[in-house]
Every structure is written in structure tokens, then in C-alpha cells.
Amino acid sequence: MNKSSRIDTITIDAYKDGDQEELNNLFCDVFSQNRSLREWEWKFKESPIDSRPFIILARSGGKIVGQHACISLWLKYQDKLVKTVEGVDNLVHNDYRGSMRGIHAKLFQKAEKTAIENGVAVGFGFPNRTGYIIGKRLFNHKDLIKIEVLFKRLSWRSALKRRVKWRFLVNFAGWISSLVIRFFLAIKGKSVSRVKYTWVSTFDESINLFWEKVKDQYAIMVQRDFVYLSWRYCRKPDNTYHILRAELDGSIVGLVIVKYEDYKDARIGFIMESLAIKDSMVVDSLLKKGLMFLSRNKVDFVLARVSSSDPVKRAFYKKGFSPKEGVWNSHIVYVKYSSHVEDSVLCDTSLWHVSFGDCDAA
């Protein structure tokens, strides 16, 4: 049977209990990954809003051959909370990939209808270059805001490794450079003496009080309350996140969340979250301590993602970060489903707080 004939046999419907194992196996096959079923359950079943209703499937002969899946979250939009979905894990088995107007289009149409029926105000996503072009051309995706990926080097090891043959020399130069960079990090900036900084592995309900303090610093951002932060950073299987909390007189006044991973010849650090009260010294100290932690763990360079108009950029620039194009996807797109949100407000870059934590890929 050729591909066009296979596409003609497709039916589109919603996820049903019991589909998860086949779905996860399809994901692992298409993306050559080894994701556990437990991670699938964390991602879709345990998300702040049950995301299983937003998994749309393509079936052929009773077999799942494609999906359009979203995770559902609460979005702070001005002075209210609206339901949002973020597109993730969208795929079609290679044997059924034909015209992009085929299975993908049918999945997207059903996903749109499902979002509207379930009271979703807006959907957004962080597509790669190919997905960005296809989404804008065929699926009515619109550019949301301008985001930037910021870069800071913590060691010259990975850069030298591509140019110098002698491993000993590369490792020695990398070690020396990391010491020098760490020294300059340590001597720059002052800490607030009354603020206590603690590395923690969990959140408790007190984080909700912090959320109430900081939520109005931005008009639009994903709700970062106890439910969301615990799900995103503490309950994920194989959790690799490191949480630094700042407290003043027993109350949380800021947090930075970081991670690092090895990729090819480099160890890459990520600033997943950077959020604090309006005190530049607290933000500065959190970033400094986060960078020192990453440096001690032999990270070669660090990436952060911010809205291009976010005031927190100033703190990153003070720590030596600079914009770097091409190092990570920097597109963010949206589809509006409700009159409860306005395009002119959604697309105002100055209103948003965005981080790597908003994307499921990091």
C-alpha cells in the first residue's frame, strides 16, 4: 500500500484511557528516544490541568500512527487566569507521512475544535525551524513575541577542543579559564546581607505567597504557583533541576532554577527560571550563585531565554550574557481561540515573562 492509500484509511479521534503505552512507544520510535511511560504520565496526566483531553490521535486499522498533543496550563493574562495549551509531541509515523495537508492538517483541525470546546483561550508553542515554517504556512500560527537566547561562557574547554589536538592542554586551559571566570563572578556584585540563599529540592505552599508578590510584575506569564512549580521541577522523572531560593525574614523573595546536560563535546547549562521581587541585588545574587554552581559542575557555557523587553535582561547582561542567534530555537507562535484575549495585548513583548521553563524541551 502506497502512502496516499494509507492516508485515506486514517481516522481522527481523541485519546482514550489505555492508549498511553502505544502512544509512548510511537514517540520513542519517531524521535529515537527512550522515554519511560512514567514520564508520559507526568507530562500529560499530572500537569496542572489534565492534558489528556488535548491529545488528538490518528489511527489506521486500529493502530495509532500520529498525534497532535498539548499540555494545558493556566496563563496569567492581565488581571485574570485563562486556560492555555502548549503544543508538544506532534508526530506522524514515517510510513504515513504524505502531504502536510494530510494527517497533520486533520489532527490540527480536531485539536482546534477540542481547544475551543474545552474553554482554551490561546495556544502557544516553541517550534523548531521546520515546524515554524509549516505552522505559519498551513496552520494559521502567528508570531507571538520576540524572544532572545542569551549566552555566557564559563570555560573555554569546548571551544578549544575543536581547535587543539592535545587533550591535556585543552583540559588544563579549560580548568584555568573556569577558575578565572569564577573569580570574576565572585568579586562582582554585592549580596543583601539579610537575605538567606538555600538550595532546595522541593517547594511547599509558601511559594504561593511569593507568586502573589511577583505576579503583577508582568501582565502575561504562565502561572508559577506551587502546583505548577512542583509539577515542572520536582515531580518530573529523572529530575535534573537545581533550585536556589532566596528568603528575607522567612519569606521567599526570589528563585533561580538551573540544570546542565552533556551534548556532543560540551556541557551546557540552562537558566530555567529567574524570578524575584523588584530588587536588583537579589536578582544579581541569585544569578551569581546559580552561575557559580554551574561552573563548579564543569559547565562550558550557559543559556537563558528571555522576552526581548524583560527588565531581567539587565541582570543577565551585568553577568556577562549576550544575545546569541542560532544556538537554540527562538520562535514562539500562537493561535487565539477566544475573545477573552486580544491579539494586540498578546503580541506586546513588553508584557511577557518567558523562560526556558516554559518549553518542554529543556
Predicted regions span which residues?
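Active-site/acyl-donor-binding loops of N-acyltransferases
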Residues: 2-7, 72, 121-179, 232-234, ...
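Secondary-structure boundary elements
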Residues: 62, 113-121, 250, 296
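Conserved N-terminal entry element of GNAT/NAT acetyltransferase domains
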Residues: 1-18, 180-203
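Conserved acetyl-CoA-binding loop-helix of GNAT-fold acetyltransferases
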Residues: 92, 97-113, 280-292
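Membrane-interface helix-loop-helix junctions at boundaries between adjacent transmembrane segments
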Residues: 96-98, 104-108, 112-136
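Short loop segments at secondary-structure junctions
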Residues: 60-62, 95-96, 155, 249-250, ...
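A conserved beta-strand-loop-helix scaffold within acyl/acetyltransferase catalytic domains
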Residues: 10-90, 129-130, 197-275
